[in-house]
């Protein structure tokens, strides 16, 4: 359950805004995902992912 679930959460995270951060620092984000993703629930987001989301939100508001 843990191994299969980890793969599923990584794929789901890749589809969201974290996907852009993964391309930049794939190794760091994957390690953080394994430590901070429990059952698909984010306990804490990496600062890089938070910055990416903030940038995207600001862009949407301008549009």
UniProtKB/Swiss-Prot annotation:
Disulfide bonds: none annotated. It holds the Pfam family OCC1. Residues 1-12 have a biased composition (Low complexity). InterPro entries: OCC1. High expression in placenta, skeletal muscle, kidney and pancreas tissues. Absent or very faint expression in heart, brain, lung and liver. Expressed during adipogenic differentiation of mesenchymal stem cells (at protein level). Residues 1-41 are annotated as: Disordered. It comes from the Eukaryota. Belongs to the OCC1 family. This is Overexpressed in colon carcinoma 1 protein. It comes from Homo sapiens (Human). The gene is OCC1.
